[in-house]
Design a protein with these regions (language model features):
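Short beta-strand/loop motif that positions the catalytic acidic residue
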Residues: 237
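A short, structured surface patch at a secondary-structure boundary
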Residues: 143-210, 251-259
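Short, glycine-rich, amphipathic interfacial segments at transmembrane boundaries or analogous
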Residues: 34, 41-44, 101-154, 215-234
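A hydrophobic, helix-centered structural microdomain
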Residues: 62-129, 176, 245, 250-266
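Residue-level signal for cytosolic alpha-helical hairpin/rod architecture
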Residues: 51, 156-159, 234
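Hydrophobic alpha-helical segments characteristic of transmembrane helices
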Residues: 23-24, 28-33, 171-177, 220-226
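N-terminal hydrophobic signal-anchor/signal peptide
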Residues: 1-83
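Short hydrophobic alpha-helical runs that function as membrane-insertion/retention elements
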Residues: 28-29, 139, 183
């Protein structure tokens, strides 16, 4: 698709590109010199007119192979570490009578529901406790529905607090990576209620074209320190539009630094 609208302002051009993004393989447009677009792009000449060719790198066959290869390598390493962590922490987690790991329904690629693995960090009756707390405390309810998290969550066990602070509770998700349900790096895996409340049709169409990730732009930028939900969605959209294997490597390095420094974790 070629967009040639010399009288359109930056906002109008952005709206048109956003509507086409994901519906066609390639977008070409004549930009204003002061316009800023952060998509994967190339500059092309079209009979003396400068075109910016924008594309989604994830749609290319070679890139899909590279990303899946990266997932398999990190998935194997992650599962080996998971085995060691399970031997150490499973007995401690089971002390309150529940299972060491649990499955939680999340929305994956193409809006399909899948079961995501996690170490159990909450009491066995956590959902019941949550309903009771939210029904009694309006401020707590507002905090929870803002980010679907509570900073001082009374449902979390003592060992669970440590697992969350160190992000070790995420390691079972490497099983999902090996199964092909998740990527190591990708948009945040969310629940259906988050999709209904915050995403909208356009954002859902773009974000759920790809697999969710164990880590991503949100985690690399401070995890829970990113408080605005719209900002989280914007970070996921930026990742999809600008994906490259190098970006995955950068996000991985930044995530490791944040985990070691326990930045934004609770």
């Amino acid at each position: 698709v070629i967009i040639a609208l010399p009288l359109a302002n930056n906002k109008q051009m952005s709206e048109i590109i956003n509507k086409l993004d994901g519906k066609v393989n390639k977008i070409k447009f004549i930009p204003e010199l002061n316009g800023t677009y952060t998509f994967n792009s190339n500059i092309e000449d079209y009979d003396g007119i400068m075109l910016v060719s924008s594309y989604n790198g994830m749609n290319r066959g070679t890139n899909k192979f590279l990303k899946r290869s990266f997932d398999i390598i990190t998935g194997i390493v992650g599962c080996v570490v998971l085995g060691i962590l399970y031997l150490i922490y499973a007995p401690k987690i089971k002390k309150d009578g529940g299972k060491a790991m649990f499955l939680h329904a999340r929305i994956g690629q193409y809006l399909k529901t899948f079961k995501m693995y996690k170490f159990r960090t909450m009491y066995a009756d956590a959902e019941k406790r949550l309903e009771e707390m939210l029904s009694k405390d309006e401020k707590l309810r507002e905090e929870f529905y803002k980010n679907f998290k509570l900073k001082d969550d009374p449902r979390i066990t003592e060992v669970g607090k440590f697992l969350r602070k160190t992000s070790l509770d995420e390691f079972p998700q490497f099983i999902n990576v090996i199964k092909g349900e998740m990527s190591f790096v990708g948009p945040r895996p969310v629940v259906q209620k988050e999709v209904d409340m915050y995403y909208g049709e356009e954002n859902s169409r773009k974000i759920f074209m790809v697999k969710p990730g164990i880590t991503g732009m949100w985690q690399a930028n401070g995890r829970s320190d990113v408080e605005n939900y719209d900002e989280r969605i914007a970070l996921d959209l930026y990742y999809i539009r600008n994906w490259s294997l190098w970006l995955d490597i950068i996000i991985t390095i930044k995530t490791i630094k944040n985990v070691i420094g326990k930045k934004g974790a609770y």
